Every structure is written in structure tokens, then in C-alpha cells.
Amino acid sequence: MNIVLFLGYLSILFAGGAIIAKIAKKIGIPDIPLLLIFGLILSILNVIPKNIVESSFDFIGNFGLIILLFIGSFEMEWNIMKRVLDVIIKLDILALLIVWIISGIVFNFVFHLPILSLIGLLFGAIVSATDPATLIPIFSSMDIDPEVAITLEAESVFNDPLGIVVTLICLSALGLAKAENPILEFFSLAVGGIILGVIAGKFYEIIISKIKFEDYIAPFTLGLAIAFWYFAEGIFPSITGYEISGFMAVAIMGLYIGNVIVHKKEHKKDMEKVAVFMDELSIFIRILIFVLLGASISIPLLEKYALPAFLCALGSILLARPVGVLIATAIPPIRPLTERIYLALEGPRGVVPATLAAMVYTEIMKHPNIVPKNIASLMPPTELAGTILVATFMTIIVSVVLEASWAKPLANILLKRKTSTS
């Protein structure tokens, strides 16, 4: 790759993305839709070649998710979160599974596939993870019950790695990834990731108690998070044949550091440096992921699949999410119905679906022969990759626009009594 051209592309992504994000902030809307559209414009003008976009996602996707999951869990307040922990668990397990299945069924129905085809279920898995972080600026300007806000934010932090786990299982079932036993695979990915995350947090605490990193604490923290991710995704599978979710491990590590080590006086300054560094880095990553997702979509692809993709998006947003949340939160102890409805209507998709869709699209387009013949007979590999990419793009942009628009009016209607007394 020509290094001069590569740096030129980066300048367009960062400078252009920053301007777009600033415009979004100025007019009071989430930056995701505008960043996606900016990427789409770059695609139309062929500013950045498709092969550069596609080859970038493997690195940017994995590296970006490590940073975003770490900082998201690092900033979670356990004292508030534990008051709604039962709701978070219901949303992150039962609701996520229901959203996955229903979104997949809708996709299969729209594209005339067998109702339980793994192709649709792969789409459902990709869009099952939420990203209410896009609503934080809106929540900050609202008189909203902090328990509702923390529920949505914590749900996202922990269903992000679970969404990745479910996607990996679907890829395994499709023959696009290796798995000996899907049930055991889920257990080793999710539970193994949690255990490894706690070990990582404890190990980090021991190291920084013995060595004063001072100005180098932030790169050490990032390096150790990546090291544990690598152990989970690379070393452990080569030894045992089973994977641990490195993303889950990173999220739990961040939660431990942000709620245990942060409160220790001797580490307070170091943790402030870590928070600032990760926050700044996450801005770069968000810009890259959303602009590159938009840039990966060609106009012919969008024209061909826009309408069915829009229907898939509506099915996931207005059917799968509400049904999943209302069923999951019907398990006692039951929260007020108005609060449950609000949670059901606020689950915008974001970074994780964007990254997963782009990575799946890139892998299939590079190696179409990896798609098994029984799957390719239902939908050709290039069409499979294209439909999932465009449907995910549409789900992200529609969910963010709709749910950011109605977040405040719905809160005034559904949560009025609770917020007025809090």
C-alpha cells in the first residue's frame, strides 16, 4: 500500500468525520447517521478504494471493539447498576435471544428464505446488540430517572460481547467458523470470558500496586487488555480447541478496574489518565467504524436491497425489540409497565452491529467459497454478504434516528410521574 495515499485517506476520515460529528452536535442530533452518510458519499465519489476499506476492517473492528467495550464498562457505576441488575440480566440474556430469533425470522420472511434459515439468524445475531451510548447526550439534557438511563447503558455494555458470542455461534453453524459443540462453545465463550475478565482485573491491580507507571499507565492498560483478548481469542483455542470471548473478558476487566481500583486513593490519578486516554481514543474509533461502514456500501448494492433492508430494520426495531423486552421484563420482580415500554422502544444499534456486519461482508467477499453449498443454494455468497451489510446499515441508521427523536417525548409521557418525583 502507498503510505502517502494511506495517510491521505486517514486525513479524510479523521478531519471529515470530526467536522461531521461537530455539525451533528451543533444541531443536537446523534452523529452516527451523519457519519454513515458521509461514508456513503465517500463511496459514491470513490474517494477511498473499496479494497482499502475492506482490508481495514479486520484490524479496526477488533481493535476498536476492545477499546469501546473497555471504556464502556469502565464508566459503569456499580452502585447504581446493582439496583437494576435483575432487569439488566433479563435484557442481556432473554431479551437478546428473542430479538435475535425474531429479527432473523423477519429477515428470512422478507428475503423469501426458509423461516428458520441460518442466514436470517446471522443477521438477527449481528443486530441483537444495542448501543444506547448514542443517547447519553440526550439523557444528560433530560429529567430522566437515573435507574432507567443506567439500565439502558449497562444493557449495551454487556449485550455487546454477548451479541458477538451469538454471532460467532451463527457463523459456526453456517460453517463459516469452527465449533465442535455450539452449547459448549457458548458456555466457554461467555462464562470463560467473565472468569478471564475477573482474573485480568485482579492481575492488573497486582501489577500497578507494585510498579508505578505514572505517565505510561494508559498504554500499559490498553496493552494488557489487548494481551488478555489475544490469550482468549488466540492462545486458549489453540491449546483447548474452545474459545473464550476476549471481548467479554475486556468488558469485565474494565468493569472491575472502573469500580474497584478507581476508588483506591493511591490509584486515583492513574485511573483519571486511563479514562481520558480511552475516551479520546474511542472518538477516533467511532469515526473510523461508522465512516468505513458507510464507505463499504456501493450505490448499486443500496439501490438493490434498500427496501427489503428497510423492512428488516423496522421488524427488528418495532417488533423484535419490543417483544423481547416486554417478555423478558415480565419475569418477577416486574418493573412498572410504562418503564418497560420505554426500555422496549429505546435500543438503538451502533458500533458492534456495524463492525460485525462489515467484518462478515469483507470475509465473504474475499473468500466466497467458504460459504457451504447448502447455504449458497439458498442465497449466493455475494448476495448473502450484501443483504446482511445493507440490512444492518439500515437498522443502525433507522434505529438511531427514530429512537433519538422520540427519546425525550416518550420519557415525558411514560416516565413523567417517576422523573417528577426523583
From Swiss-Prot:
UniProt entry keywords in alphabetical sequence: Antiport, Cell membrane, Ion transport, Membrane, Sodium, Sodium transport, Transmembrane, Transmembrane helix, Transport
Superkingdom assignment: Archaea
Pfam family, one: Na_H_Exchanger
Annotated InterPro entries: Cation/H_exchanger_TM, Na+/solute_symporter_sf
Main location class: membrane
Localization: Cell membrane
Gene Ontology, cellular component aspect: plasma membrane
Record keyword Isomerase present: no
Membrane-topology descriptor: Multi-pass membrane protein
DNA damage keyword on record: no
GO terms, molecular function: potassium:proton antiporter activity
Transmembrane portions of the chain: 3-23, 28-48, 52-72, 93-113, 119-139, 157-177, 183-203, 216-236, 242-262, 281-301, 307-327, 341-361, 384-404
Any Gene Ontology biological process: intracellular potassium ion homeostasis
Function description: This is probably a Na(+)/H(+) antiporter.
Family listed: Belongs to the monovalent cation:proton antiporter 1 (CPA1) transporter (TC 2.A.36) family.
Protein name (database record): Probable Na(+)/H(+) antiporter 2
Biological source species: Methanocaldococcus jannaschii (strain ATCC 43067 / DSM 2661 / JAL-1 / JCM 10045 / NBRC 100440)
Organism lineage string: Archaea, Methanobacteriati, Methanobacteriota, Methanomada group, Methanococci
